A protein has these predicted regions:
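Rossmann-fold dinucleotide-binding core
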Residues: 132-227
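Rossmann-like NAD(P)(H) cofactor-binding subdomain of soluble oxidoreductases
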Residues: 79, 84-169, 185
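Electropositive phosphate-/nucleotide-binding environments in soluble metabolic enzymes
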Residues: 34, 38, 58, 85-89, ...
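Alpha-helical phosphate/pyrophosphate-handling elements in metalloenzyme active cores
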Residues: 235-249
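NAD(P)+-binding Rossmann beta1-loop-alpha1 motif at the extreme N-terminus of oxidoreductases
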Residues: 5-77, 86-87, 356
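NAD(P)-dependent Rossmann-like dehydrogenase/reductase catalytic/cofactor-binding core
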Residues: 212, 219-220, 246-260, 264-382
Length: 382
């Protein structure tokens, strides 16, 4: 790993025209106090950054300051005394590394608001969501790169259930087109005691998270039909996103590693997976608009799958299962027809550097079968 630290007296280093702070003792801001944003803020504080967690309202900030706990999203985790908590109204002028713990749908609007409140363009900005940005289904890192330039943008993926990440660690992946930015973020997490891989493939890492959420939703929607159906649904979704990722120039390792299959298996095994639970509720006939309230948090996959289906179609990718899942969410396809589609679809034979979509489907079917169980386990908040 390249060492991006500079002597404290030097203060800052210039890398590829980007001014990067010495991470240790410098200021990081996490925007968004959901389960994952809160967990990341705790880890950053442990990793030596002077960290601020920003909530949507001052009332929320006051609650967290008084209780030293995010009881709604991360119960049982004591917030470090050194973690500063404030609302987004406080602005970002002090931030030297910015982490966005926001749903993908909120990124464009929120970044515009934050720019007006002092977000500087010459600091690294890290996307942490696992979805697509409306209306065109763009990846979060690409939306940010359009505003700030690709050398200042990074993203995070991998199996990272928030509660477990704080207590027992996780296996994160940080990706950026700028290797030195990836080094910087990796260093902070390693100092916090979290395994963190780095890559120059933000497209692959983000699509791995998108595929994982969509596949978990699909598995939940077919769970009542058996493990084979659930595994097939997840495998088909993953294979279709795989083909799309190939067209965007992503690396196979990104989807086959921690950010893709690793994240999906963690979600499938998790006792509280939001996206899989949403699929179960969808199959039970709960109206899609009511599902987030039933689960208690935003469901990234419910919003992302229609965008994903559209993006795959525009890219010319054959994606019958993703398209069918989008129709199921919209109430345009009955559940029995969705299940039949999953059972009868044969993956395309498109190839990607020696790998076939069918081989990916087989891997996913194996990964999603759970020995000695009769149904997929219950939800992850990553």
């Amino acid at each position: 790993m390249a060492d991006v630290r500079q002597p404290r007296a030097a203060g800052r280093s210039t890398i590829n025209s980007l001014v990067l702070p010495n991470p240790i003792g410098r200021r990081a801001i996490v925007v968004g106090a959901g389960s994952f944003g809160t967990a990341i803020a705790v880890l950053l504080a442990r990793g030596g950054l002077r960290t601020t967690l920003q909530t949507r309202t001052e009332e929320q900030a006051e609650q967290l300051r008084e209780s030293h706990e995010n009881a709604r999203y991360l119960p049982g985790i004591k917030l470090p005394q050194e973690l500063r908590i404030e609302s987004v109204e406080s602005g970002l002028s002090r931030g030297e590394i910015i982490f966005l713990g926001l749903p993908s749908r909120a990124i464009t609007e929120t970044v515009a608001e934050l720019e007006a409140r002092g977000l500087r363009r010459r600091v690294p900005i890290v996307a942490m969501s696992k979805g697509l940005v409306p209306p065109d289904g763009q990846l979060p890192s690409r939306v940010l790169a359009q505003r700030f330039g690709p050398l200042r943008v990074a993203c995070i993926g991998g199996p990272a259930h928030a509660q477990e990440m704080v207590n027992d660690g996780a296996a994160l992946v940080v990706a950026s087109e700028n290797e030195n930015v990836a080094n910087l973020i990796q260093q902070v997490f390693l100092r916090a005691g979290v395994v963190c891989e780095k890559t120059l493939d933000p497209v692959g890492v983000e699509l791995g998270g998108v595929a994982k959420n969509a596949a978990a939703l699909a598995a939940g929607a077919t769970e009542a039909q058996g493990l084979n159906a659930a595994g097939a649904a997840a495998g088909h979704i993953f294979a279709e996103v795989w083909d799309y990722a190939a067209r965007l120039g992503a690396r196979p390792q990104s989807l086959l590693g921690l950010a893709g299959i690793g994240d999906l298996v963690a979600t499938a095994l998790a006792p509280h997976s939001r996206n899989r639970r949403a699929g179960e509720l969808l199959a039970a006939g709960v109206p899609p608009a009511e599902i987030p309230a039933r689960v208690g948090q935003a469901i990234e996959a419910m919003e992302t799958v229609p965008l994903l289906a559209r993006a795959l179609s525009l890219a010319g990718v054959q994606a019958p299962v993703t398209s069918g899942l989008s129709q199921l969410i919209a109430g345009e396809l009955p559940l029995d027809e969705w299940t039949q589609l999953v059972r009868t679809t044969v993956p395309s034979t498109s190839r990607w550097r020696g790998q076939t979509s069918r081989a990916v489907t087989a891997r996913m079917r194996d990964a999603m079968r759970f020995k000695g169980t009769t149904s997929l386990p219950p939800e992850s908040d990553s």
